[in-house]
Amino acid sequence: MAQKLSNLANKSKVKFGSLYGSPIVWIVADKNHAGYPSNSVTLVTNQIIKMLCFDATEPSNGNSDRRGYGNNRYIYSNLRQWLNSPAAAGQWYTAQHSADQTPDSSHVWNGVNPYSSLAGFLNAFTANERAALLNTTITVGKSST
């Protein structure tokens, strides 16, 4: 029987959204999590659902680490864009800065798990499922050096 997420106990499992035609199983991680919108429920997937790089290598970046490993800033990450996009296959990516690069087979480690041609993560979610998601501001640390 369907229930409101807010009525479920922490660690309860729920099916919400889908990936490759299969429902995604989530665990209720917390309710009214500090720093998140009021009356919100935080979900985390029950298991790893996809292994993707955080960001593609950026060969034209002036920072040698970012040339070889991609950008470590969440705001610029390919993964952030993909996870938050309902766009069709190959349409979710937009360059976030002048050296940004798509996560295609030439710019991910050993060509493993490129995802530039995939649909956005939210693409297979229903309109009602997407409407139930809350916008959240993620605060991350940035080195002062």
Language-model regions, residue ranges each:
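Collagenous Gly-X-Y triple-helix signature in extracellular proteins
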Residues: 1-145
